[in-house]
Structure formats: C-alpha cells, structure tokens
Swiss-Prot record:
Record-stated family: Belongs to the UPF0102 family.
Lineage of source species: Bacteria, Pseudomonadati, Pseudomonadota, Betaproteobacteria, Burkholderiales
InterPro entries linked to this entry: Restrct_endonuc-II-like, tRNA_endonuc-like_dom_sf, UPF0102_YraN-like
Species the sequence originates in: Bordetella avium (strain 197N)
UniProt GO MF annotations: nucleic acid binding
UniProt xrefs under HAMAP family: UPF0102
Protein name according to UniProt: UPF0102 protein BAV3162
Length: 145
C-alpha cells in the first residue's frame, strides 16, 4: 500500500483535468455565494450516502448547494445533469448530515450553481427536499428543545 501511495504522490498518474476544473468552479461558486451573504458551514461533506459540495446558511435557511461545471450546453447543460436519481442521493446525504448537526431544525433548501461556458447560474430552490427530510428536521428540532 505504501508503494502505491508513493507512486501517486510522485505524480506519475496525471489527475483528470475535469476534476481540477470542477474544483475551480466550486471555489468560484463559494466566492460568489459568500458575496451574496451566504455563510459556509461545510465543504465537500461526505457520508455513506454521498458528498455535498457546499452546505451554507442563507439567513436562517440551511442551503445544500450542488456545483456543476460543463464546458458547453450539450446534453442539456450543467443544471440538467442533476436528474431525479442525483436529487435523491443529495437528499439522502443531506438527511444523514442533518441527523448529526446542530442545524437539524432549520428549513432546508437545495440550490444548484451551474457553470457553463464561463457563466454562472444560481438556481435557488432548484428542487424540493423529499417529505421525509422535512419530517426528520422537525423531529430533530423537537428533540433539541
């Protein structure tokens, strides 16, 4: 295992340039959202259900932001790449994150920050969280009082 890690550290395996571009878009998106007054709580929060790019506060609302980057609008573009299956994974990951968070009682919103051809598009409330997440948040609020 140590050899493999040494091999990777030396840079003999080239990183995927799309991954680097996605990270740049995420950093740019974070700056944009902070400029709009949102406060960062977590970045790249991972759990058994997946990864949440950005978890932020917009006033009293907890916002889960999925950042997507595409070089063009082929195949529907960046925002269209977040279909029902991805939305469900994000919702499950958010529910898991909320379960262990002091923010469990807050209202939840899912936003998408889509970058296409250098342009950013912020879709507030891009999709509704499933009812089970809302009910988990309310139950957690009751337990914390």
């Amino acid at each position: 295992m140590r050899r493999l890690l040494d091999f990777l550290r030396r840079g003999l395996i080239r990183p995927d340039p799309r991954h680097a571009q996605g990270k740049r878009a995420e950093a740019q998106g974070l700056r944009l959202l902070r400029a709009q007054g949102l406060r960062l709580l977590a970045r790249n929060a991972r759990n058994r259900h997946g990864e949440l790019d950005l978890i932020m506060l917009d006033g009293e609302v907890l916002v889960v932001v999925e950042v997507r980057w595409r070089s063009g609008s082929a195949f529907g573009g960046a925002a269209a790449s977040i279909g029902p299956a991805k939305q469900a994974r994000l919702a499950r990951a958010a529910a898991c994150w909320l379960a262990g968070s002091e923010h469990a009682g807050r209202r939840l919103r899912f936003d998408v920050l889509a970058f296409e051809a250098g342009q950013a598009r912020w879709l507030r409330g891009a999709f509704e969280p499933p009812a089970y997440i809302a009910s988990q948040a309310l139950r957690a609020r009751g337990r914390r009082r």
